């Protein structure tokens, strides 16, 4: 396999696009490689400008549960496109999509459509602060909630210290109200509650940006109880896990009903769409009814709404979809682990529905500190081997992989065989 055209394209892109990419992870920096420049996608496959094709486990970082260029979704988008791309006015499609989302998630009375997960979490936090009338928020190490300033923070020397910016350009004043707790650690979380005037807590119930690390059930139930004890708004960030892990997102596994929730990715089926929602008494604080301002020129645009609605209709029609996707994810993760073990390579694997992850780590990963102990050099070698064997994996050991509906057992078995070849070559130093 060669990437000559991709190398040339990347060099050209770096002359006119900052870093050569429009989202940092796409640069393949952490795996010391060159990103293939993609020409098209179809089903489970990506095709690049060098005429290479790959089985794609990134799926645009999660949205494409039905794979690339699904014919039904594509046809509906084209029909909607002919009527106009954006109106900046209400449409019936928006109401229909809102009803479909609400019907799948307990405790969800109303939603507001936005364009990205970052907008959704940013707006949900603003709304939660207004409702609680308290400024401080708790987030968790390793959980990613978009790139708004108050959420780009990391823990200091201890989990109960106020956050400090982890990105240049973020003033301390923007992050001083953010406290960072240890994921899956209730003691750390309660210390944050005691230290600050906490109005809301935001968490990924199934974390996807430190690798795949699900919350422990007793932890999430305990977190809900702490929010009730300290009268704080609980926000579940299901931008990644919503309609991915199951039809009801994390609720399938935990049964936790939040005050607010955010969705994205799958509900846009590959077009820019996200939402936040929750109890009516909180959501009614939003303008134009209440005093919490949130707006967007392209929010609820008909193309994205149509794509998302088409995906949700397909999901609801297919009663065995999540069972099949889960089975494929288990087949993949178990196959990878068995192969690694045969070469005495430490590998921890897991899945939640169609989401999967693996760590080159001797122990189970329960939080961000555990994830950081993983062998990232081994991951980089493995990633490059697999890429050149036609398997497109997330280009960071701290990302999550995704199964899509067009994938088959035969594809999974082929990928496991290629992983076995890769492990063999790594051990032999080839």
Swiss-Prot record:
Its main location: cytoplasm. Homodimer. This is Glutamate-1-semialdehyde 2,1-aminomutase. One of its GO terms (molecular function) is transaminase activity. HAMAP family: HemL_aminotrans_3. Its cofactor is pyridoxal 5'-phosphate. It is found in: Cytoplasm. Signal peptide: none annotated. It comes from Helicobacter pylori (strain HPAG1). The modification N6-(pyridoxal phosphate)lysine is found at residue 265. Pathway: Porphyrin-containing compound metabolism; protoporphyrin-IX biosynthesis; 5-aminolevulinate from L-glutamyl-tRNA(Glu): step 2/2. It catalyses: (S)-4-amino-5-oxopentanoate = 5-aminolevulinate. One of its GO terms (biological process) is protoporphyrinogen IX biosynthetic process. Keywords: Cytoplasm, Isomerase, Porphyrin biosynthesis, Pyridoxal phosphate. CDD domains: OAT_like. The lineage of its organism: Bacteria, Pseudomonadati, Campylobacterota, Epsilonproteobacteria, Campylobacterales.
